[in-house]
Amino acid sequence: MHPLKVCALVGALALSSGISLGQGNAPQGAATAPVESPPPAERGRYLADIGNCVSCHTRAGGEPFAGGVPFQTPVGTLYSTNITPDPKTGIGSWQADDLRRAMHTGIAPDGSHLFPAFPYTSFTKVTDADVDYIYAYLRTLKPVSYTPPANGALFSVRWPMGLWNKMFFREGRLAADSKQSEEWNRGAYLVEGLGHCSACHTPRNLFLAEQPGNPYQGGRIQDSVAPDKVRPWFAVNLTSQKHGLGAWSVADLSKYFQTGVSLRAGTFGPMNEVIVNSLKRLTPADAHAMAVYVKSLQGPELTGEAVAAAQVASGAAIYKDRCEKCHGGSGRGGFFSGPPVAGSAVVQAEGPASLINIVLYGPTVPQGMKFGGWETMPSYADILNDDQVAAVSNFMRGSWGNRAAPVSAAQVAQQR
């Protein structure tokens, strides 16, 4: 499963409610590829890596980019397409302008609307030149004759997506901000465009379109917690507020993008594929540019219900027994013990799903991605009951200056 399952969910839920999903100026500060002008296909490979194309277009055990990844939704299953240059089952018959149209408008060569599991709502911001580089790269791939399984019946209905697009989609390339540095603009271009970070990290409205007034304030997604087991996750708030990335520095973010670990956190869950197949391949300059842009994001502080003192106290003993050895009595963790939970965006997230998942299932970490003396956290699903998981979660969400809404045993039960 992939973090972008949320985009398929957009299409599915909009269909179930009767509404489906369906050129500006190039930014001056957005260089189109790594320096030293490598051949177009090599530029395209790098850009496709930033877009993380391989994760959503490569099924388990399948050929790279041949599609077939299932996007499970409440109204059926949607499968990713074959984007190898096979002329019959892939996109071998596509021309460069066909890919531009698909990425910029969400329209296929035959005029049908694409589902936003393919995040054209973000890709519309990518320059024509960069799309052409990606096209050049895709043409070099091994053609694979493979037809993904048929989509669920409701996904055969595509025309209503045009209405959704008119309501919520704005086509156009990303314009540079003359008030910001070239590095900031480069970071904005990568985060907003190919990186499509908002697809997971921005909350959605009633029709499951991204809320333009609340960018990067966290979003609900669906992904695996264990083999063949999908549960909700909460993609953290990326703004520099206290409950977001306020405790992170630009250096922390840049290191995390390139290695999956930093003094603040290590990758786990839905971010694993994003790190391994995409961000880890960034040049140092681009990783730093993205970090500069992300660190500039602003949003309001949380003002809702907070964990009460009695709820905090109820989980203190569990934390001391099960968590303190690695995360410390101060919640600050350490290079030789574990990541901090004080100031953690995951711990303080508006939705507690990701925190609960870590406690229940442990954070699955990519092989070889270890920081300092951090040990792999065990699963507590068979050790702690729902009340205990809620209690220790509340202790962390209400201690060391953390502030977040309380977690209930019912919420824990939903994640099992």
Regions found by a protein language model. Give the residues of each.
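Positively charged n-region of N-terminal signal peptides that target proteins for export
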Residues: 1-6
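Bacterial N-terminal signal peptides
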Residues: 7-18
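Flexible coil segments in periplasmic/lumen-exposed cytochrome c-class electron-transfer proteins
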Residues: 25-39, 50, 58-78, 109-188, ...
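Short Fe-S-cluster ligation motifs
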Residues: 79-100, 228-240, 354-373
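Aromatic- and charge-enriched surface segment that lines or borders ligand/interaction sites
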Residues: 91-107, 111, 133, 246-250
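Extended, polar beta-sheet/loop recognition surfaces of beta-rich domains
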Residues: 257, 342-387, 391
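C-terminal structural cap/anchor segments
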Residues: 316-357, 373
